[in-house]
Each structure stands twice: as structure tokens, then as C-alpha cells.
């Protein structure tokens, strides 16, 4: 059996030009939005990078560049579905995924189960294979000042 580990990281800053945010494929009511070329889903972006990294296929920017207008304002679930196809082509399966959302606000806990269900559905895995946790920076740094949100994702693949 062959195992591969991937790590992904993403960060987006808040903007007053939008309202509400999308994290893990779930829309969350908030007075600000996230600045991004796509929908700004930091969790899905980091997850895509984790899977691509484990497969040795670069990163999300290589496959879906922010200079390409076809990806402007696109739903990030599209990226994850395309990367799932790459995973299948390489004949790897997901053992588990562990995600950390780092945000001072809004609170993520009420939305985590919906996020897990959304991601499991796209990746065609069990919800139990995905863990999502949220933390703050205790008001330190740009996240603590509520200027943005970051995520880390680790995935373990096997074949």
C-alpha cells in the first residue's frame, strides 16, 4: 500500500465590497465578504492544495489561475470536483482529511457539520473521514483584528 500526505494553506482578506462568506461550500451570513478572484472559499482552496500536493500535481493556482477570467467569481466546489477527478485518475483514495479554520469572526462551529457533509459529498467519502475544527488567534495579528480568515488542511491518501 502506498500513502501520501498533502498540506494546504490559504488566506483571504475581508472586503466591504461583498457580504457573506463561503467556507467549506457553505454560505455564512456576515457583514463582510472575502476578497478573491473566485468565491474566496479558503477551506476548499486549502483542501485542493492539500490533495494536489499529495498527488505531486502542484497547486490550485497552476490548474485554475486567477489570471483566467473563466474562474472569476466561480464556485470553488467546481475546483474540488475537478481535483477529485485527478485523484481518481491517479488511482488514489482519501484516507482522511483534517482542517483548521483560523478566524476571529464569524463563529464557525454552527456551520461545521454542513461543511463536512458538503465536502464529503463532493469527494464521495464518508463524513467521518473529514474533521474540521476552528480556532481564533486570541485577537492577535491580522486574523485577530478581523481582517481575514486562514485555513490549514492536511490529507492522507492511499493506493
From Swiss-Prot:
Pathways involved: Isoprenoid biosynthesis; isopentenyl diphosphate biosynthesis via DXP pathway; isopentenyl diphosphate from 1-deoxy-D-xylulose 5-phosphate: step 4/6
GO molecular function terms attached to this record: 2-C-methyl-D-erythritol 2,4-cyclodiphosphate synthase activity; metal ion binding
Chain residues that bind a divalent metal cation: 10, 12, 45
Pfam families per the UniProt record, alphabetical: YgbB
Cofactors required: a divalent metal cation
A biological process from GO: isopentenyl diphosphate biosynthetic process, methylerythritol 4-phosphate pathway
Gene3D superfamilies linked to this entry: 2-C-methyl-D-erythritol 2,4-cyclodiphosphate synthase (3.30.1330.50)
Keywords annotated in UniProt: Isoprene biosynthesis, Lyase, Metal-binding
Catalytic activity: 4-CDP-2-C-methyl-D-erythritol 2-phosphate = 2-C-methyl-D-erythritol 2,4-cyclic diphosphate + CMP
Binding site for 4-CDP-2-C-methyl-D-erythritol 2-phosphate: 10-12, 37-38, 59-61, 64-68, 103-109, 135-138, 142, 145
Residues at the site labelled Transition state stabilizer: 37, 136
Cofactor, how bound (note): Binds 1 divalent metal cation per subunit.
Family listed: Belongs to the IspF family.
Assembly mode: Homotrimer.
Function: Involved in the biosynthesis of isopentenyl diphosphate (IPP) and dimethylallyl diphosphate (DMAPP), two major building blocks of isoprenoid compounds. Catalyzes the conversion of 4-diphosphocytidyl-2-C-methyl-D-erythritol 2-phosphate (CDP-ME2P) to 2-C-methyl-D-erythritol 2,4-cyclodiphosphate (ME-CPP) with a corresponding release of cytidine 5-monophosphate (CMP).
Protein's UniProt name: 2-C-methyl-D-erythritol 2,4-cyclodiphosphate synthase
Protein species of origin: Francisella tularensis subsp. novicida (strain U112)
